[in-house]
Amino acid sequence: MIDGDGYRPNVGIVICNSHGQVFWARRYGQHSWQFPQGGIDEGETPEQAMYRELYEEVGLTKKDVRILASSRHWLRYKLPKRLVRWDSKPVCIGQKQKWFLLSLECDESRVNMQRGSTPEFDGWRWVSYWYPVRQVVSFKRDVYRRALKEFAAIAMPFKERKERKLKRYKSKRG
């Protein structure tokens, strides 16, 4: 399913833990890392697609996570010309993504990347909140930055937000 502008509807998933870290997954057989993501099927809502992709790619179910937020708008990125399949119709020039911020509500041992028919990932780790913006493939960086910026106030632990406010207060007074 590709829209009239050549973008494939897709969901992006940011899973955070109680320490403000995010789930960072290594693409199967590659050295590249990214957040879980995947296409929205015909007749599927973005939320339904998110839960399906979450299970297929990470092995987690609806009861394992809690939705904290979703992006207000679709965030788009264009594929580099070398990755566009010009011979397929309609031509897909990029992805438009609805992003979801989830909190992990279960033990991390429930993560199982072998649940889908073809594994997307072969490893994962927790990383600092902003780390993915610097590490993801370059053509996705702006979308990652925008999604994480939108979710930052919700995802960052309360303690960290409180410490930042205290620092700002002290610097204004001192």
From Swiss-Prot:
One record GO biological process: mRNA catabolic process
Nudix hydrolase domain: residues covered: 6-149
Entry GO CC: cytoplasm
Keywords associated with the record: Hydrolase
Enzyme Commission designation: 3.6.1.-
Stored Pfam families: NUDIX
Cofactor or coenzyme needed: a divalent metal cation
Transmembrane regions listed in the UniProt entry: none
Domain of life: Bacteria
Database matches in InterPro entries: Nudix_hydrolase, NUDIX_hydrolase-like_dom_sf, NUDIX_hydrolase_CS, NUDIX_hydrolase_dom, RppH
Motif (Nudix box): 38-59
Gene3D superfamilies for the chain: Nucleoside Triphosphate Pyrophosphohydrolase
GO molecular function: mRNA 5'-diphosphatase activity
PANTHER family for this protein: M7GPPPN-MRNA HYDROLASE
Family, per entry: Belongs to the Nudix hydrolase family. RppH subfamily.
HAMAP family according to UniProt: Nudix_RppH (MF_00298)
Official protein name in the record: RNA pyrophosphohydrolase
